[in-house]
Amino acid sequence: MENQLWHNTVRCCNQYQESPHDAEDILLLLLGLIVLVNIGINVATMMWHGLQNALDKMIDWATQKNEIQASESPPSGPPDKAQDVHIHCILDPVQVKMSRPTQYSSFSCHHFSNHHSSSLLRCVRRRRRRHRRCRRRCCNHQQRPQNYRQIPHSHSVFRNPHRSQKMSQLHRVPFFDQEDPDSYLEEEDNLPFPYPKYPRRGWGGFYQRAGLPSNVGLWGHQGGILASLPPPSLYLSPELRCMPKRVEARSELRLQSYGRHGSQSRLWGNVEAEQWASSPPPPHRLPPNPSWVPVGHSPYPSVGWMLYDSWDQRRRGTEGFERPPASVSRNARPEAQGCREHHSPQSHQQSLLGHAYGQSHRSPHPSTEPLGYSSQDPREVRRRAADWAEALPAWRPLTTSASLTVLDEASHQRTPAPSSVLVPHSSQPWPKVQAADPAPPPTMFVPLSRNPGGNANYQVYDSLELKRQVQKSRARSSSLPPASTSTLRPSLHRSQTEKLN
């Protein structure tokens, strides 16, 4: 019994002792569970952050890779290719109509500057060919007894201004006129005097209408090498031509000096002057019998001109000659001066020098040298003078037969009776010549002192200086009585100091 009670007590004690152990175990378990949960949360948090970082990195890498692939790889759609633009240009050939320009009474700046150096060379070559043709023509036409001129009166360079204006209005045709190219040529056929269909451009802006074949094929109608280009005059507008320019010309062209007050200023090349001087004059200007020409008289009549050539004067200056005085052929006939100055050696030498200079340009006959005819019969002299007057041409723009008229009263008073025997008297009345005031010597055109390149044969002409001298010569010519126009050798300057009443 006692043992049973013992056992029950021990059990109760054991039960009391086991119960706190269970509470501690439960607490430990709870603490363990809390720790485990905390660790699990932390691990889960760490894993989440790690996974989140990994996901972010993967997303960033994927986006960068896509951007790189998008930039490197071509777009998925077909690319727009650049289209080639093909431009076909068709250049039509330019049709050129050569129209005659307005003829000016004197040169201005743009007349001289119209020509380039290349056109000067072409003009020289054309004049050489024209010179050969003119020689043949003059040789063939010397036997022709009729009035024949190499340059007809209606084609003269120094023509009436009203007539030149009318002709310029008839023949002024625009270059780019799209009408019939031969429409203005039909008007030329109706004119009373012939013109070449395609005029040739000459020196100084004039058309030499001498019936020579033209070279328009170089520019237009005949399909020359420059048919597709406009003529050079299109580039020279009036504004450009009036601007000051430097015009260079070689001295082989031998530019002419300016003439006297009454002359119209012209510039001509002495290349053409040599052609005119070498070719014989027209036959109708010759006297019936040159062997009986009076003393000191040229077969060509005179009205008191003094013709100068600047190049020839420079050459004479180098040879020691003096310029022929202007009084040799002014205010009196050459034969009367030859009679008056026969006993004066110096004046006789000057008159012979002026006479030889005029003969070298105007007379190829050596038989016109001074001869003595004081022993001839006056009736024979009068009869031959009448023949002389009949042989002279009827058309006299300057009344050039005035050298055969009666001398002035002063000439009769100065010369004795033997010289009056030589005076021919015609049945018809002759016009009386009134001498004008003596004019000063011609103003020489002095080029500038510049000499580019050191070449002695190369001069520079200033267009402003040229224009100034042209205006000065115009002012002088306007102050003097009007001089009648005529056709002369274009290489020589004309100066008329006598006026016909």
From Swiss-Prot:
Keywords, comma-separated and alphabetical: Membrane, Transmembrane, Transmembrane helix
Residues making up the signal peptide according to the UniProt record: none
Segments traversing the membrane: 26-46
A Pfam match: Spem1
Any single GO CC term annotated in Swiss-Prot or TrEMBL for this entry: membrane
Residue ranges, annotated region (Disordered): 316-384, 409-501
Tree of life domain: Eukaryota
Major localization listed first in the record, in broad terms: membrane
Localisation per UniProt entry: Membrane
Membrane topology, as annotated: Single-pass membrane protein
Comp. bias regions, Low complexity: 476-490
InterPro entries noted in UniProt: SPEM1_N (IPR031368)
PANTHER family: SPEM FAMILY MEMBER 2, SPERMATID MATURATION PROTEIN 1
Stated name of the protein: Uncharacterized protein SPEM2
Organism: Homo sapiens
Annotated gene: SPEM2
